[in-house]
């Protein structure tokens, strides 16, 4: 088998074929001329450009191209299940399920499947869902084989992810290798059959794709024109198809229409269900690069990834020299070294380095409460908050103590509730809070809780905490380095916050940074300055009308005014005596 790309088989309606000469099936001219560099691993069953892989069974021999058979001759059959393999280009396309454990069953038609991905394809066909997306035009398909057939319809240049050369998958391209002069390439056969042309009379004038209905053609043409007539009424986004708008509106609501047939978990979007189904089957990635062995969930990710052999990481951080496989991973990592916060909240001025952090923050705003209570219409930002709120509507508590029959809303409250057998027999009751105990020693220990903090006899010299009993003091494992990691270099006193340490250091340095604007006094702490400025404010209240002096309270002003009155009376009496003298 030559080292050339093999295009995925085209699934056409089975019609009698005329006898063909016995020779090996030749690929299209453009793909045959595109050869890989020497030493590249051969992949006869897949294309790394489109991401379609048909992985063979390791226990079987490599596929051999059998001669094409004339119509009417019996073809090869599977030796286990008897399935006809004549229409398949390779026997490995038939995966016999005989002898395997079929554990995935369709809930609608009860059909059984060996793998969860087969069940997903089956359900997508029934529900007309299209989880397999083309990496070139973003068109969706229900089956992986349909996506492989669709890739051959693109006429634009496609880059090979291994040798980075470009070629046209549907037309003859320039030879990628300087080989011997080749014969003129035969024109590529038309991919539209006469029967399909009669069934689909409407064709796109740009890409020649046929359609059965005019509405389908109009919807398809928006891909080329970029028209987006469907606008969201809740935000300023617009879409080219109504289904895309319906898909987008689920981001504003709590609707989850896609349900897993295996575990009945629900999802908002079909792509989330597709990723979830891989977890049941163990096939977490369908598309694999044959050079760097990276796996991808979608063919578009395989097309866009920069291929690096042997797991190389060419993108290196300039700060910490950490290497990454993708430039997007490097850009995301570089934000940890800088103050860049490209993800801004549109409701407040806060910014975030990662998108998931922004999404988590937006739920804190009261304007976005997607989780609604079905009884009172109250909204919540988190589903756990809604679940906690719904306990209010229940007629009885969910968790009940089997001993004292006390009910609790949460299981954690029931675990914290320490109920002893025979709880009704508690003769020792506290006169302050009416709490009862079985033993007098327990009541005495409880009564210490009503005492003031100064009455606690035992004090820890490291963290200044006080305790009632010696058992509590022994159980208290004080770690000042953990609780108060900041230590004063002058007196070894520890603090929990840097601001507390900075304020304490002024005791040793004598620094007084807070100065009064009304006088020449200065203070070490801001609260001392605020208390001092109240003195100046009160001085403006009581003013003497004789001399203009100000006082803090009215009693001092009255005492001061009495001195002025006495002096004035004495002066007036002396004037009268002087006037009477001859």
Curated annotation (Swiss-Prot):
GO terms for cellular component: nucleus. Residues 1-39, 174-198 are annotated as: Disordered. A zinc finger (C2H2-type) spans 76-100, 104-126, 132-154, 202-224, 230-252, 258-280, 287-309, 315-337, 343-365, 371-393, 399-421, 428-450, 458-480, 486-508, 514-536, 542-564. GO terms for molecular function: DNA binding; zinc ion binding. There is a cross-link at residue 130 (Glycyl lysine isopeptide (Lys-Gly) (interchain with G-Cter in SUMO2)). Keywords: DNA-binding, Isopeptide bond, Metal-binding, Nucleus, Phosphoprotein, Repeat, Transcription, Transcription regulation, Ubl conjugation, Zinc, Zinc-finger. Transmembrane segments: none annotated. Residues 1-14, 174-196 have a biased composition (Low complexity). Disulfide bonds: none annotated. The modification Phosphoserine is found at residue 281. GO terms for biological process: regulation of transcription by RNA polymerase II. It is found in: Nucleus. Belongs to the krueppel C2H2-type zinc-finger protein family. May be involved in transcriptional regulation. This is Zinc finger protein 319. It comes from Homo sapiens. The lineage of its organism: Eukaryota, Metazoa, Chordata, Craniata, Vertebrata.
């Amino acid at each position: 088998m030559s080292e050339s790309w093999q295009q995925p088989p085209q699934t056409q309606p089975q019609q009698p074929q005329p006898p063909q000469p016995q020779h090996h099936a030749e690929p299209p001219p453009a793909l045959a001329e595109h050869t890989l560099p020497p030493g590249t691993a051969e992949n006869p069953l897949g294309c790394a450009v489109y991401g379609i892989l048909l992985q063979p069974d390791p226990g079987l021999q490599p596929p051999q191209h059998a001669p094409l058979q004339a119509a009417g001759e019996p073809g090869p059959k599977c030796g286990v299940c008897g399935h006809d393999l004549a229409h398949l280009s390779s026997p490995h396309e038939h995966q016999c399920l005989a002898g395997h454990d079929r554990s995935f069953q369709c809930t609608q038609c009860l059909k059984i499947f060996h793998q969860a991905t087969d069940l997903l394809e089956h359900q997508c066909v029934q529900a007309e869902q299209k989880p397999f997306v083309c990496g070139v035009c973003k068109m969706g398909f229900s089956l992986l084989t349909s996506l492989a057939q669709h890739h051959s319809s693109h006429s634009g240049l496609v880059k090979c992810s291994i040798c980075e050369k470009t070629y046209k998958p549907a037309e003859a391209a320039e030879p990628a290798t300087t080989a011997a002069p080749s014969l003129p390439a035969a024109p590529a056969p038309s991919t539209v059959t006469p029967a399909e042309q009669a069934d689909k009379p409407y064709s796109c004038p740009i890409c020649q794709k046929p359609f059965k209905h005019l509405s389908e053609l109009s919807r398809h043409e928006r891909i080329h024109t970029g028209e987006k007539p469907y606008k969201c009424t809740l935000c300023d986004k617009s879409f080219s198809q109504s289904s895309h708008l319906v898909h987008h509106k689920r981001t504003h609501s709590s609707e989850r229409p896609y349900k897993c047939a295996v575990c009945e978990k629900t999802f908002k979007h079909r792509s989330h269900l597709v990723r979830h189904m891989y977890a049941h089957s163990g096939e977490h990635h369908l598309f694999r690069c044959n050079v760097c062995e990276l796996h991808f969930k979608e063919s578009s990710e395989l097309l866009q990834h920069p291929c690096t052999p042997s797991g190389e990481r060419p993108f290196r951080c300039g700060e910490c020299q950490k290497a990454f496989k993708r430039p997007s991973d490097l850009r995301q990592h570089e934000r940890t070294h800088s103050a860049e916060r490209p993800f801004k909240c549109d409701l407040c001025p806060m910014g975030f380095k990662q998108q998931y952090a922004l999404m988590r923050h937006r739920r804190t705003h009261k304007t976005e409460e997607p989780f609604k209570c079905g009884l009172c219409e109250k909204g919540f930002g988190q589903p756990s908050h809604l679940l906690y709120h719904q306990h209010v509507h229940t007629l009885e508590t969910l968790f009940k103590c089997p001993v004292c029959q006390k009910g609790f809303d949460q299981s954690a409250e029931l675990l914290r509730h320490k109920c002893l057998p025979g709880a009704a027999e508690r003769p020792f009751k506290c006169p302050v809070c009416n709490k009862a105990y079985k033993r007098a020693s327990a009541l005495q220990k409880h009564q210490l809780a009503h005492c003031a903090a100064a009455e606690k006899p035992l004090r820890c010299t490291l963290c200044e905490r006080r305790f009632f009993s010696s058992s509590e003091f022994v159980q208290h494992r004080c770690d000042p380095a953990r609780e108060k990691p900041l230590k004063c270099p002058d007196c070894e006193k520890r603090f929990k916050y840097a601001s507390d340490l900075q304020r304490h250091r002024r005791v040793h340095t004598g620094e007084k940074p807070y100065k009064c604007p009304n006088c020449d006094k200065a203070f070490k702490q801001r609260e001392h300055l605020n208390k001092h400025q109240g003195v100046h404010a009160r001085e403006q209240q009581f003013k003497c009308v004789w001399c203009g002096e100000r006082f803090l309270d009215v009693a001092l002003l009255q005492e001061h005014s009495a001195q002025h009155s006495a002096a004035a009376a004495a002066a007036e009496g002396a004037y009268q005596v002087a006037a009477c003298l001859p």
